[in-house]
Amino acid sequence: MIDTLQARLDEVEAHAAHQDKAVDDLNAVILDQREELDRLTRRVNVMLTRLEALEAAAPGPEVTKPPHY
């Protein structure tokens, strides 16, 4: 019976070790994705700033009536 309990304990410890490794791996992926998301957010903000500057500098559309009026 002691051998059976030891075998079960060893199996549980092995599963726990694999789960710890999986959690660590997933955490690393999440951190990488967070960094990528932050980088992309900064790039989008830069592009929005540039677009707003271009829109402010561009002449507005002419206000004319359509030809059918």
UniProtKB/Swiss-Prot annotation:
Coiled coil: none annotated. Pfam families: SlyX. Transmembrane segments: none annotated. It comes from the Bacteria. Belongs to the SlyX family. This is Protein SlyX homolog. It comes from Maricaulis maris (strain MCS10).
